[in-house]
Amino acid sequence: MRDIGINGIKLPTEDCNDPECPFHGKLSVRGQILKGIVISDKMTKNIVMKRYREKWSYKYQRKQRVSSKIHAYSPPCMEAKIGDIITIAECRPLNKGSSFVVIENKSNINFVDNLLNVDDKWREELYVKDLKEMISLIQKEIKSLPSKSSELPIRLDQLANCQRNLYFISGDIKQLEDSVDNFSKSVSLTPINSSDKLIRLISLGKTQSFLYKTTNDVSSLDSAINAYGEAIETYNVLSTITNNYLPYFLTASKNLADLLIFEYEKNKNASDLKRAVYYYNEFLNSAPTGTSNTPIVLKRLSSAMKYYYTLNQDIDYLEKEINYIQKAVNITNSSSANLPGLLIDLGDSLNEYYECGKSKIPFDKLEKILIESRNSYMKAKGLISDDSINLLKIFNNIGNVSRELYIHTNEISYLKEAIDFWRKSIKSEDLNKQNYSSNNILRLNNLAVGLIDLYEVESDPKYLDESQKIWNRLKRELWTRKNYKS
């Protein structure tokens, strides 16, 4: 996925092979960046967006709110439909009347995200008004259509999308429930093994996932799993004719696997975990090189291996966990915001592998594991800002790993490094006013013990004095914590 040079936008969650896509093709964006609501998606790849803005009225000497309509090109990965809240950017003229391209669809979000955040309250109210008008208009059209009309599933699809977007803005759960019902009707009226069936099943699965996330109703989770499973079956039939629908298969496979992981976490049924791993691997086996969701899938596969280790206590699963995260790190762009988190996860996995494998892994291999873990944390440290909440964790973990390396190698430089990073982690936590947390008490204890070890090696009394000060502070904090709790 290309970096288009615009900060603050939500990147597309799906891939596409459209050459006119700013993210997956070669189209450059420039100039104006505008936000609005889709009021028409009748054209094949173009949409009409309604934009609201404020302008100064010299006649009345006050601000006036006005609207305008803009045509924009919508790449397949944006999936912009009527009722969606979108962001468009100016580009070279793509076709008659269109010099804008959709670069963000706030409505096409993952079911673990929050409701839509509209920039201004007055815009939110206008979007709600527009959506209610669209819903009312589409409902009237549906009533006027014959029961076997080919237009009926299209209108039901549009109605469901508008209702889902109204839920995103207003939080009205009834709109989401109605959206699920109308997507279900649309799917039931769509011809079997058609491309429209595939697309609508995925929309149904996403909406049922939203409903599960909102209500925690297990039946919604099961329905979403069934919808994605049916979407994959539909794709398998379509793929014998053409491979144009591969992005939809990748979406269905990833989302189905994610839901099966949720199901496993709820019921601890090993068959759900096995199915999730199968569909994650189906995604990896089918995804073209450079697919944007591949690192995410690799990370989730690593989590699945952790679950397998918890079930079987087989250390080989921890090795697989490390391999998957390492692959995710290797294919993630160095400028990606996800890279520091992946590096921290890699360091954590290596640490766990070290702790669990002390009695099973050769001594020289244990040292290599520690060095890899330390290097992973060091790389993450170089990529995050000084005010990041992850910095404290990194400082502490580097200290712990360096201490273990000192025990393995007897190199004093590792002990000094451990002490230095423990000091930094304590200072960082002090700045965040978390002095009495159990983690900080553990860090103080580690630092005091490390200073005593350093004193025994170098016989410098300053280390002993500092250690004594740390012990005194530790006593004070333990006393304060005890009184605070009581």
From Swiss-Prot:
Transmembrane segments: none annotated. Residues 113-486 are annotated as: Unknown. Keywords: Ribonucleoprotein, Ribosomal protein, RNA-binding, rRNA-binding. The keyword ATP-binding does not apply. GO terms for biological process: translation. GO terms for molecular function: rRNA binding; structural constituent of ribosome. It holds the Pfam family Ribosomal_S17. The keyword rRNA-binding applies. GO terms for cellular component: cytosolic small ribosomal subunit. Part of the 30S ribosomal subunit. One of the primary rRNA binding proteins, it binds specifically to the 5'-end of 16S ribosomal RNA. Belongs to the universal ribosomal protein uS17 family. This is Small ribosomal subunit protein uS17B. The lineage of its organism: Archaea, Methanobacteriati, Methanobacteriota, Stenosarchaea group, Methanomicrobia.
